A protein has these predicted regions:
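Short aromatic/hydrophobic "clamp" motif used to bind/position activated sugar donors
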Residues: 57
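Non-catalytic, C-terminal membrane-associated alpha-helical segments of glycosyltransferases
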Residues: 199-209, 223-252
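Short, well-formed alpha-helical segments that are part of the catalytic scaffolds
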Residues: 10-26
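Donor nucleotide-sugar recognition loop
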Residues: 136, 146, 150-171, 180-189
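Conserved donor NDP-sugar-binding/catalytic core segment of glycosyltransferases
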Residues: 38, 65, 69-110
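Active-site donor/metal-binding and catalytic loop motifs
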Residues: 181-201, 206
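A recurrent flexible, glycine/aromatic-enriched loop bordering the glycosyltransferase active site
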Residues: 120-144
Length: 252
């Protein structure tokens, strides 16, 4: 059973994402849990976890759309090898921004809307489609085994807003010995780009204070990335595993 947990106070977005996941998982037992009055993403996800019954938990933003059609099969395969998977993260977390350490530690594949109706496929980091040894993941989309979430919970006291809950959850998982991976064959469109503001900085400071002694040493560095602009009708073909691997090889 897959338990899909989404926090959203936007009815139109909530309706879309429910329909999207119901379609993706139509051939698999699943439940969709909407938290429409979350006080924070930590609090909302904790409530969703308490309501859930599945052995695989998915925590998703409300503004994503998968290009990959066989998401359930890929998740089942990845979670047979790892405990927590996502679409962006780092093998070296040096502060409250997962991209801070730069190349060769950061890995991602995410698609953003661009001008003229095109979309930009953004690939970060060379290597295989599925990268093990991850220390922290972005929270745009996360999937994990139930025992991970139950054993860790969510820190709604320190992260009582909508930022850094994801790094807190996934870095905590890493510190507890769970196996994390970035799986870039889970290609999705993310309708929004995060913009750090004063609230984000507040929670970044809280995160660094909480984990100061566990963060890796290092100075910020640039990431290596590849950007490809495509019309929507070409996305599925481009995001097939062999095609993606070929594109990512250009970063090597």
């Amino acid at each position: 059973m897959f338990s899909i947990i989404v926090c959203s106070h936007r009815p139109t977005r909530a309706q879309f994402i429910r329909g999207h996941f119901d379609h993706l998982f139509r051939d698999h037992p699943h439940e969709f849990i909407l938290i429409n009055d979350a006080r924070s993403l930590s609090e909302g996800n904790a409530r969703g976890l308490a309501q859930s019954t599945g052995e695989v938990l998915i925590f998703s933003h409300d503004d994503i759309e998968f290009v990959t059609p066989d998401v359930p099969e890929r998740l089942a395969r990845h979670l047979g090898q790892f405990d927590v998977v996502g679409i962006a993260g780092t093998t070296r977390l040096i502060d409250g921004a997962w991209v801070a350490a730069g190349d060769p530690y950061c890995f991602a594949l995410v698609i953003y809307p661009d001008a003229d109706g095109l979309l930009v496929v953004k690939c970060v980091g060379a290597g295989e489609l599925c990268t093990p040894g991850i220390q922290a993941l972005d929270g745009c989309f996360l999937a994990c085994r139930r025992n991970v979430a139950v054993s860790l919970g969510f820190d709604a006291r320190n992260f009582d807003g909508f930022h850094l809950y994801d790094l807190d959850f996934t870095f905590h998982a890493y510190l507890k010995g769970f196996r994390l991976a970035v799986c870039r064959d889970l290609a999705l469109i993310h309708a929004s780009k995060g913009k750090p503001d004063d609230r984000w900085q507040l929670y970044r400071d809280r995160f660094v204070t909480k984990y100061r002694d566990q963060l890796a040493a290092g100075v910020p560095g640039p990431v290596r990335e590849l950007r490809v602009r495509l019309p929507r009708q070409k996305l599925t073909q481009f995001c097939e595993p062999l095609a993606l691997q070929k594109a990512i090889a250009r970063l090597g």
